[in-house]
Amino acid sequence: MKKLAISIGDINGIGLEILVRSHEELSKICTPFYFIHENLLNKASKLLNLKLFNAKIVAFKDDKDYEFNFIKKENSLEIYSFCLPLGFKVDENFEIKAGEIDAKSGLYGFLSFKAASYFVYEKHAHALLTLPIHKKAWEDAGLKYKGHTDALRDFFKKNAIMMLGCKELFVGLFSEHIPLAKVSKKITFKNLSIFLKDFYKETHFKKIGLLGFNPHAGDYGVIGGEEEKIMEKAIAFVNAFLHSKKDEKFFKKALKDENLQKELLLNFKGKGVYLPYPLVADTAFTKAGLKNCNRLVAMYHDLALAPLKALYFDKSINVSLNLPIIRVSVDHGTAFDKAYKNAKINTKSYFEAAKFAINLSLKT
């Protein structure tokens, strides 16, 4: 079976409960490695009145060298150690504060995630599944990242792309956790062309639509529309480039050379992967809109996530594209209001994420 490295997220949230409750079923489809120290797992188990049986847990430690070892088997748990350069000393002796924002749990969740990421990168597992973190807890811990995807960009020096959804609807995010006021400035021909090229090469979707940035996609310039003009130009260029089968070197050169862009467009005939004009976002998510195109790109976070979660919240997942590792996540937060209360918790997104990761790993 495929091996999944699973980071625990913020231990003050619902992640640990999802992990423990789902372990038996998850183990039927993969071999999970949970990145948590035994004493913290015991504390959480006591609070939840739940036990984790027949599982593999990985204690991670800051060290200059990478080293993975089996330590012992105890109380039906297989305990491993994974040493790597984390940049922080690991503190696993703090108290769990159910439902609270806490710097210690924030830092621990980050280190669990970083260790699990490199565990996959070092080929000890086939994919990474991350449980939800709290961005404020990361900030309070002194971390500079706005979330998992932002950190992965830094770890692997790649332009990671966030995609969310399910088989009925997937949406790629051109921008993620930045203020709305900054999105327009980010929409440039170069930035968008690179994104569209990478998004297609990672997904190979047959038809992709871009959601307009302005109301009614600019309405022919009546409501703004400058961003839509840039989008149309980038769409035409990327469609022509993908059709041409030319290489990355040519792409980089053509980004700066309008004559090469014109040459590509003159030689391009027929339909492209991307629909030629931005879609009006307020109708793109209707039944008719999704029947026409259910693989979309949004210029900003909430333009995609508000309708996606209204339609498919329980089964949507988060996928990081354009990385040297496979990374998936649940598409929900820490749910501090439900943590350690034996509340009803839906685990569908967790299982969908695991299945998606397994299927992706079978293709690589």
Curated annotation (Swiss-Prot):
Q: For binding a divalent metal cation, which residues are annotated in this chain's numbering?
A: 177, 216, 301
Q: Which GO terms describe its molecular function?
A: 4-hydroxythreonine-4-phosphate dehydrogenase activity; cobalt ion binding; magnesium ion binding; NAD binding; zinc ion binding
UniProt cross-references to InterPro entries, sorted A to Z? PdxA_epsilonprot, PdxA_fam
Q: Which UniProt keywords apply?
A: Cobalt, Cytoplasm, Magnesium, Metal-binding, NAD, NADP, Oxidoreductase, Pyridoxine biosynthesis, Zinc
Q: What class of enzyme is it?
A: oxidoreductase
Q: What else is known?
A: The active site is located at the dimer interface.
What is this protein called in UniProt? 4-hydroxythreonine-4-phosphate dehydrogenase
Organism whose genome encodes this protein: Campylobacter jejuni subsp. jejuni serotype O:6 (strain 81116 / NCTC 11828)
What phylogenetic lineage does the species belong to?
A: Bacteria, Pseudomonadati, Campylobacterota, Epsilonproteobacteria, Campylobacterales
Task: Tell me what gene encodes this.
Answer: pdxA
